[in-house]
A protein has these predicted regions:
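Helix-start (N-cap) detector for alpha-helical repeat units in TPR-like alpha-solenoids
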Residues: 25-27, 60-61, 94, 394, ...
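Register position in tetratricopeptide repeats
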Residues: 38-39, 72, 106, 406, ...
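Amphipathic alpha-helical substructures
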Residues: 43, 72, 77, 251-297, ...
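Structural marker of alpha-solenoid helical repeat scaffolds
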Residues: 55, 89, 423, 457, ...
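Juxtacatalytic substrate-recognition/specificity segment
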Residues: 110-236, 243-253, 263, 270, ...
């Protein structure tokens, strides 16, 4: 079985070892069945399971496989029953015990969630805590369904199952990803077991690009189906990262920068080119989760996405489709040879030449964003923000500015933040704090410059988009306000201020349906508080 890992989301790999799922040999009779499951051929796997149980009703391997099929179908309680029956016959099999544990833990989580549906997806989320996510999640997934279908020519016939874990323990239970995986490698989503899983953005300080992560996971689902689960990790990850924003952004012109070239990714690629130190496609196996640092993980995604950029520039949409189809019957090097007419080594060399020719430039102040699981303490976010400031002098001055602002002295706080910027001029945290206090003093125009600079360094900060929304709202630039506030929802959808502003904005631009949705969301957030 081949699998792949991704920044902000990981396709299942060797991480299941903690559950013992790979701890024993697979019964040869069901090896093909496992391959059917992991390539999403669920109906065929179900036929095999039914036939096997019918012929050998007291066969532990047959009952175990029947449990796996039910698990992949989302029938978790029935899966537990099948695993129990198998364990009653042979209780020593660690792999079987692992599957039973995973099924039981998943059932314990999912039974607390509400089911939501759209034409092509079934979503499970905690209604009380995460119910506001459902309409945004399903809208994103439906747009991804259409955009990726147009790009790659695949539309799943069955509804795709999606699960949003409400917190880190629940996410660990259903995905096997740990707290370390989230905070050290950015693993907040996973595609496995015939479904997509992410952790709620509410569970992380400052949120994350959760809707793009859903689209990213859906891409993995599509790639598995199109390649019969034979795509190598670099292709999996590269395609998922390259296409994950297609649901919200049109295909850029041929000579324009693709969306994967974020400030951090550009900087990492520039450094890799200068030092000739790449992660390399082979080192991405068996999973990016095993790379040592967040920077290595992010560089791996940047390399993989740029390889897809290279393929797309040279072979276009048809080339990507042919590559995936060819992988169903040939190895990766053979597929490269067939599609590109060159060896895999030549492909890698040409890709690096392509990168050199892009004229990438490092972005001063950019760095890999690290995720942090939120605690129950409000001050935790302030502590996390301060730790993001690398300069000790800037950190001290920022902390002093916070204390001064807490005493109601906005003008003095602004001066202190400006002093902090002298020591760390590209810090998004300080730039945002300065902009926020300027807005507080109704100096909206002055807030634009620090916010633009913050966005240039870090385009994934919800705070920057919220403050820009306030600036545009005050100036009655409602279309611009709409754009940045909707961007904030895509990162941290739990800020009531965003929806207060959006109610005004949607009303002003004449969008009654969105106005109603924003009002409902605002009411739910304020009532919950």
């Amino acid at each position: 079985m081949k699998s792949a890992a991704l920044f902000f989301s990981f396709l299942f790999a060797a991480i299941v070892l903690s559950f013992g799922l790979e701890g024993a040999e697979v019964d040869p009779k069901f090896k093909q069945g496992e391959e059917l499951l992991d390539a999403w051929h669920i109906a065929q796997a179900e036929e095999l399971a039914a036939k096997s149980v019918r012929e050998s009703p007291k066969s532990a391997p047959a009952l175990e496989f029947d449990g796996r099929v039910k698990f992949y179908q989302g029938r978790y309680q029935e899966a537990v029953k099948s695993f129990d029956q198998a364990l009653a016959i042979d209780s020593q099999n660690q792999r079987r015990q692992g599957w039973k544990l995973l099924a039981q833990q998943t059932q314990d989580v999912i039974k607390t969630l509400r089911r939501y549906e759209s034409p092509h997806f079934v979503l499970f989320a905690d209604e009380k805590r995460d119910g506001i996510l459902a309409p945004y999640a399903l809208e994103t997934l439906e747009k991804s369904y259409q955009a990726i279908g147009t790009e790659l020519g695949f539309y799943p016939k069955e509804k795709v199952r999606v699960e949003i874990a409400p917190d880190a323990p629940a996410f660990n239970a259903i995905s096997t990803l740990s707290l370390r995986d989230i905070e050290e490698t950015g693993a907040v989503g996973i595609c496995k077991f015939n479904k997509l899983m992410i952790i709620s953005p509410r569970a992380l300080s400052f949120g994350y690009r959760w809707v793009d992560s859903l689209s990213h996971e859906y891409l993995h689902y599509v790639i598995v189906a199109l390649s019969n689960n034979q795509a190598p990790i670099w292709l999996h990850e590269g395609m998922a990262r390259f296409y994950e924003t297609r649901w919200r952004k049109p295909v850029p012109p041929k000579d324009a920068a693709e969306d994967y070239l974020t400030p951090a990714n550009q900087t990492l690629l520039v450094q890799a080119l200068e030092k000739n130190q790449f992660v390399g496609f082979k080192n991405m196996e068996p999973s990016l989760i095993h790379l040592e640092t967040p920077e290595q993980v992010q560089l791996a995604y940047a390399e993989a996405a740029s390889a897809i950029d290279f393929i797309n520039q040279n072979k276009g949409q048809a080339g990507m489709r042919e590559m995936l189809t060819t992988l169903t019957e040939r190895s990766t090097p053979e597929a490269i040879e067939k599609v590109f007419g060159m060896s895999f080594e030549s492909f890698e060399s040409r890709w690096k030449d392509f990168l050199k020719g892009k004229g990438l430039k490092g972005i001063e102040g950019s760095r890999v964003r690290k995720l942090k699981i939120k605690t129950d303490q409000r001050e935790d976010e302030e502590i996390v923000e301060l730790k993001e400031i690398q300069s000790a002098v800037a950190r001290q001055r920022t902390h002093l500015g916070d204390q001064i602002l807490g005493k109601g002295r906005a003008e003095a706080a602004a001066r202190e933040y400006q002093r902090a910027l002298q020591a760390s001029p590209h810090s998004p945290v300080i730039l945002n704090k300065l902009a926020r206090v300027l807005i507080q003093m109704n100096r909206y125009d002055e807030a634009r410059a620090p916010l633009k600079k913050a966005l240039d360094v870090d385009p994934d900060s919800a705070s920057t988009y919220v403050q820009l929304g306030r600036v545009h709202h005050a100036a009655k630039n409602y279309q611009e306000a709409r754009s940045v506030l909707e961007e904030a929802v895509q990162i941290n959808p739990f800020n009531p201020l965003v929806y207060r502003l959006l109610v005004d904005v949607y009303t002003a631009v004449g969008d009654p349906e969105k106005t109603k949705q924003a009002k409902v969301t605002l009411d739910r957030l304020t009532t919950a508080k």
